């Protein structure tokens, strides 16, 4: 079976987002008419892959997300998974 996944990785709410704070501090230099209350920078990883079943695909995505894609000490993750046909 062939799959497409999007893994969303976000800093935990308790973790300060230095990059987001830097962007927020400078938004008005580019877009003077908006006032940003909160800005967080996140990551999205998109991948297509083959796996024997949807259950196995989810198991493997869990492992990848925990061990490779996210720093689980400071980040949370979730994903969308869909079966695709070529």
Residue ranges of model-derived segments:
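Long, contiguous binding/interaction regions
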Residues: 2-46, 50-86
């Amino acid at each position: 079976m062939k799959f497409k996944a999007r893994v969303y990785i976000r800093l935990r709410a308790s973790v300060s987002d230095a990059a987001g704070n830097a962007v927020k501090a400078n938004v008005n230099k580019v877009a003077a008419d908006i006032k940003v209350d909160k800005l967080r920078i996140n990551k999205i990883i998109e991948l297509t892959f083959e796996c024997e079943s949807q259950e196995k695909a989810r198991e493997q995505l869990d492992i990848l997300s925990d061990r490779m894609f996210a720093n689980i000490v400071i980040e949370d993750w979730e994903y969308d998974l869909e079966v695709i046909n070529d």
